[in-house]
């Protein structure tokens, strides 16, 4: 039992060593990779929704360090599905942004396909739903939501907007804090900076269109606050 625990701990350390290489935080292939149990590495990557991220690094390994052919084919098959999912999410994000702008709302895609652009390969991130911030205030936004999709349950910072196969969450505010005083400060700051985020238009890869996404400076605070909140509620994985 002790040997298994040590082995798993060692594999976890190898995983994090290799992950740094996969996201190009380090340039050299980690020495520890030669001790990788690729079935264990695959299981960790799948659990953390990082299949595509690790494959990006695996493609750069010499043959003697790479997974066996059968596992590699399975890995590549899943990564190809992730690639296709990203294409759909890029296209859907463009549609959603366009539709809301047509309705007179300034908007900004939070996390999601905006975060995908921060990866070495924008198709390597496992996508989820579409989180979109709308300017205009909770009351005005809910009037529109209730007109288009009646009977949606409003939460403090967002409401579901089931208008396509891809799940959409419409945000009145990007984030919040639990402690009222801290949340007041955060909402004040968000009120000052969200105009800039809605104006930050970027081009998606391969001509899929344009969307508004947060600036890197904004994401430094926003993503960390999102992680902080999830640690105390739903839990959080490594994929962002």
Describe the predicted segments one by one.
Residues 2-128, 133-240:
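Conserved NTP-donor binding/palm subdomain of two-metal-ion nucleotidyltransferases/polymerases, i.e.
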């Amino acid at each position: 039992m002790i040997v298994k625990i040590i082995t798993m701990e060692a594999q976890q350390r190898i995983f994090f060593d290799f992950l740094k290489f996969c996201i190009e935080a380090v340039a050299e292939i980690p020495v520890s990779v030669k001790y990788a149990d690729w079935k264990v590495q695959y299981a960790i990557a799948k659990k953390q929704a990082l299949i595509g991220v690790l494959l990006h690094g695996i493609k750069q390994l010499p043959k003697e360090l790479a997974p066996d052919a059968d596992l590699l084919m399975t890995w590549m098959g899943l990564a190809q599905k992730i690639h296709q999912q990203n294409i759909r999410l890029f296209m859907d994000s463009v549609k959603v942004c366009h539709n809301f702008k047509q309705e007179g709302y300034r908007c900004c895609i939070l996390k999601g396909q905006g975060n995908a652009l921060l990866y070495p390969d924008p198709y390597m991130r496992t996508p989820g739903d579409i989180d979109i911030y709308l300017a205009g205030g909770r009351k005005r936004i809910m009037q529109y939501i209730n007109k288009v999709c009646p009977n949606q349950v409003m939460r403090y910072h967002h409401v579901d907007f089931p208008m396509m196969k891809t799940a959409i969450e419409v945000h009145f505010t990007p984030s919040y804090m639990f402690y009222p005083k801290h949340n007041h400060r955060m909402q004040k700051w968000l009120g000052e900076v969200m105009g800039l985020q809605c104006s930050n238009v970027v081009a998606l890869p391969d001509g899929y269109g344009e969307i508004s996404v947060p600036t890197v400076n904004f994401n430094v605070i926003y993503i960390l606050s999102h992680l902080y909140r999830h640690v105390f509620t739903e839990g959080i994985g490594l994929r962002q």
